[in-house]
Amino acid sequence: TFTDLEKLGVNMTAVVPVGLTKYRQGLYPLTEYNQETAAQTLDLIEKFGDECVKKYGRRIFYAGDEFYIKAHRPIPDPDFYEGFPAVEDGIGMIACLKEEIEFAVEDSDYNDALNYKVTMACGEAVAPYLRDMMKIIATKFPNIEINVVAIKNNFFGGGVNVSGLVTGGDLIDQLKDKDLGDKLFIPSSMLRFENDIFLDDVSVEDVERELNISLGIVNNNGDELVREVTTVKE
């Protein structure tokens, strides 16, 4: 398949692992990737990508971030992604966000006067990486406590662990009566295009009411994330 696509002259191919929910009764049997099979697939994708770099000067074949997470492999550096041509498809999203946060923090003045706590909810897959990114923000804003909470996807179940499929109901169930601080942030990918309804038809207002907290919706942009987190109380 890789060779066939290469012959067609495609500009870029993104390869992502299948995500299986608990709602698969009567459907074609599919096997979810584990650490071993994810690593094998990743080796194959990177092999073809490296060959394309030698032939054409560009990678063409990219693996989704989830393959690196499942294979327990480090996320490649930003240069690997050649300008992030498929970041919206989950290709290099973690590396891109981290780089943007680093640039935004580098341009920020040191400020230890801001003193408050916020919570950032996300899917289980990205939580460890997001926690590391929040440490970068802490280098310039040491008294802002940013608590990253991984939300288990009980609604879809199975191996679904990405932020974009977290539902409002799961947010409410898992964050109820928790100390969330002064604001709760979520990525905009959790919401439908109107940016006010989750996939389970729970609204932003429902979550704010049930958790008694203001909800901040942040796009997958490091500069915006740093700005939002550091301006809760100015």
Can you annotate each of these PLM segments?
Residues 3-14, 19-234:
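Auxiliary Fe-S-binding modules of radical SAM enzymes
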